[in-house]
Design a protein with these regions (language model features):
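Short, charged juxtamembrane terminal tails flanking transmembrane helices
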Residues: 293, 495-501
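Short, non-helical or kinked segments that cap or interrupt transmembrane helices
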Residues: 35-45, 59, 80-93, 143-147, ...
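Flexible loop linkers connecting adjacent transmembrane helices
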Residues: 47, 80-109, 134, 143, ...
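Transmembrane alpha-helix interface/packing and boundary motifs in multi-pass membrane proteins
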Residues: 27-41, 71-83, 158-163, 257-267, ...
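Helix-loop-helix hairpins and the membrane-proximal interhelical loops
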Residues: 1-60, 133, 139-140, 191-296, ...
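Alpha-helical transmembrane segments in multi-pass membrane proteins
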Residues: 22, 26, 30, 34, ...
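Membrane-interface alpha-helices at helix entry/exit sites of multi-pass transporters
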Residues: 58-62, 99-116, 287-299, 330, ...
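Membrane-embedded alpha-helical modules
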Residues: 111-227, 338-492
Length: 501
């Protein structure tokens, strides 16, 4: 009964005219940036953060959430029609989706992706409604030492699940933690790492870093390597799957939904892991495994359901623990802090309308996405054909205006440009910026909880090992780090044996 009452509160909040409009705007923008390869939800949300200052908290968060899960829908469109994934989570969809399109079944492939995404998004949101409240209740029992250990685990998980070199990921985390230290120490009043620059006394702006690393950095990278989009499937007919198609897509959609919902909670790239894992499992157990890579409908249904389910459940750590599971969730935490909301388990009790309004808006948003993705497919095809060289200058101007509007300080524009160049350099060096952003968000919070824990324990560092929850979390972090190091150590051992021979 309590769940029904909470959902009623959520529907009452989400079904206001303004929130419906912002939900529609969010999923529309999400679909748009998903359709355009190179423009991801991270860059888009980073660019829109300044706008959230002027919006009510619930409306702003509903819109930003819609951009995130809406981009998963849009990413499948380019995967199927152009063989270019709009989102990283849609990479697997290209394998069979594009082949279906070349066989004249583009409409069926698009409908399959939309239906699987809608089902997965709806079910995953139900999981969020069921499991988020108990987890939030558990989190209320956490002390400062437990929160510190939880954040250590989150950073270690981000390192373990990051793409590329483990050493690079650790380096990016350290850089993020150092950036979080810049500014005035709230306890001593002394400036740290400001190098005599007055504009750094308040610290490095989160929006400046996010816009630079993910917005401007992506623009530079994509202008250097503009994707060739010559083979675009424009003839689309017969959207409805056949009876045989329905049979073949049913179980892959169900399995992808469950798998994606579970992996979406993991820090890092849960939705990406979910789509790859779902595709691999279906390829192994399917009766039609020989058709995979040649236009199997299971190869579209499974990854699309998995990545959309993962996008929904990635909100669980954010709404219950205040821990971001991916860069987009880190930006969502930034948006909440901008609105004066302290992310964490207290949100469900102190602002239940906000908590349940966001959850219910996801159901509404998934319904909007089905309407946007199928009837308007002709419009998305025309948008795909817009050259980047015309699109990105407008985005660059928008970034500069957005950053300047926060404080009316010209220095922030130069700083954004600096982080844009750094983001581009990091990409060229195969250093994923996501762990840096997570560490930049969590660093000041970790420092705060570390000081509280040491103050309450009178300077006794063993408090982190004496508390059961904290000790368990630190043990898990250590195990994750050890497991991630084993392959590298094994590889070096093999290389040493080869040199001896």
């Amino acid at each position: 009964m309590e769940l029904i009452a909470n959902l009623h509160l959520g529907f009452t909040t989400a079904f206001t005219g303004a929130n419906l409009l912002y939900c529609l705007a969010g999923v529309f923008l999400g679909t748009l940036i998903g359709v355009l390869p190179g423009l991801g939800p991270t860059a888009t949300i980073a660019m829109l953060l300044p706008i959230t200052f002027t919006l009510p908290p619930i409306s702003a968060l509903i819109m930003l959430a819609g951009i995130y899960y809406g981009s998963q829908y849009g990413g499948s469109t380019t995967s199927i029609l152009v063989n270019v994934p709009g989102e990283a989570a849609s990479v697997v969809t290209t394998l069979d989706g594009y082949q279906m399109a070349r066989q004249g079944r583009a409409g069926v492939a698009l409908a399959t992706a939309a239906i699987a995404s809608f089902f997965a998004g709806t079910v995953a949101t139900l999981f969020l409604a069921l499991f988020a409240p108990p987890l939030a209740e558990l989190a209320l029992k956490f002390g400062p030492a437990d929160y510190f250990s939880l954040m250590v685990l989150g950073l270690i998980a981000a390192v373990v699940l990051a793409q590329g070199s483990l050493l690079h990921a650790v380096g990016m985390v350290v850089l993020g933690l150092l950036l979080g230290l810049v500014g005035t120490d709230v306890n001593s009043g002394l400036e740290r790492f400001t190098f005599g620059i007055p504009e750094l006394a308040d610290g490095v702006g989160f929006v400046v870093v996010a816009m630079g690393m993910f917005g401007l950095g992506e623009i530079i990278r994509n202008l250097e390597n503009e994707t060739l989009r010559s083979e675009i499937v424009t003839k689309i007919a017969g959207l409805m799957p056949t009876k045989e198609d329905w049979k073949r897509m049913l179980w892959p959609t169900l399995r992808g939904t469950v798998l994606g919902s579970a992996l979406g909670i993991l820090p890092g790239s849960g939705s990406i892991l979910g789509s790859f894992a779902a595709y691999s499992i279906e390829k192994k157990i399917s009766k039609n495994s020989a058709e995979f890579g040649k236009g199997a409908i299971e190869g579209v249904a499974a990854p699309e359901s998995a990545n959309n389910a993962g996008a929904q459940t990635s909100f669980i750590p954010l709404l219950t623990l205040g821990i971001p599971s991916n860069p987009v969730m880190a930006l969502m935490i930034g948006a909440m802090i901008i609105q004066g909301i302290q992310p964490g388990p207290a949100v469900i009790n102190e602002q239940p309308a906000l908590f349940w309004g966001i959850i219910v808006s996801m159901w509404i948003g998934n319904f909007f996405l089905v309407i946007l993705n199928l009837p308007l497919i002709g419009m998305w095809v025309r948008i795909i054909m817009v050259p980047y060289r015309f699109l990105f200058p407008a985005i660059l101007v928008f970034c500069a205006i957005g950053v300047f509007s926060l404080k009316n300080v010209e220095f922030d524009i130069y700083f954004m440009a600096l982080f844009g160049v750094l983001g581009y350099i990091f990409t060229k060096l195969d250093c994923e910026p996501a762990p840096m952003l997570l560490a930049f968000i969590l660093g000041p919070l970790m420092e705060q909880y570390l000081r509280r824990a040491m103050l309450l324990s009178r300077g006794d560092p063993t408090v982190f090992f004496r508390r059961p929850i904290s000790a368990t979390l630190l043990t898990l972090a250590l195990l994750a780090l050890i497991v991630s190091c084993i392959p590298a150590l094994y590889k070096k051992r093999e290389e040493a044996f080869r040199e001896e021979q």
